[in-house]
Amino acid sequence: MKLMVFDLDGTLLNTLPDLTDSVNYAMQTLGLLTYTQAEVAQMVGSGMTVTLTRALGKQNLDYLAEAKKLQAEYYAEHCNDKTAPFDGVTDMLQTLAANGIAVAVYSNKDQPFAEATCAKQFGTLVPYVVGTGPDGVIKPDATRLLALTQRIGADRCLYCGDSDVDVLTARNAVMPCVSVTWGYRTRKQLVESGATILCDTPDQVLQYAQKYFA
């Protein structure tokens, strides 16, 4: 079975507007400084606990538990207000499916958020969604991803993401990694993290996948 595994935030979906709003809701409610989307973009990628830890800074870490509660409450209601696929992503997923390549998402979002977001944005185009479970284990740990590949019998896999975390995740899963440059890390950051296959558009990702799985 051929399987293409995608990161979600910054790879398939531009979730940054809603993520920024949710972080800023927590920060503002606590009477703390808020952030621009560009600033939040550099905080995301390792789960919301890490994002909020970065947002709060060392001097405000006592607020972490409350910030997590506030952010989660807001995001549950607004996680798809402004979120949308990047241009060309839906067509890419449709073509992959037509070529007999199954699609999975491997995300640091909590499982319910990951499932709800994929269902709303992509319907049946993403049949396999793996988010963070109750144990709180996040990428770059590849345990949940490898469990999925074993469960569905995927023996040829390709990983695609937009961050250094994804490069490490693919390495831990022993999968080739396609790094996309339209997400929340710069090309320079990706190269410095060890990325060797870089694509600037979903069409380039599709072309690489078609050659890889040929």
Residue ranges and their predicted role:
Residues 197-201:
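Short acidic-hydrophobic, aromatic-tinged amphipathic segments that line or gate anion-handling sites
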Residues 82-84, 110-160, 164-173, 187-189:
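Substrate-recognition "cap/lid" segment bordering the active-site pocket of phosphatases
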Residues 1-91, 99, 112:
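N-terminal helical cap/lid subdomain that shapes the substrate entry/recognition surface
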Residues 99-101, 151-156, 212-214:
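Glycine-rich phosphate-binding loop signature in dinucleotide/nucleotide-binding domains
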Residues 181:
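Nucleotide-sugar donor-binding loop of glycosyltransferases
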Residues 92-119:
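Substrate-recognition element of Asp-dependent hydrolases with the DxDx(T/V) motif
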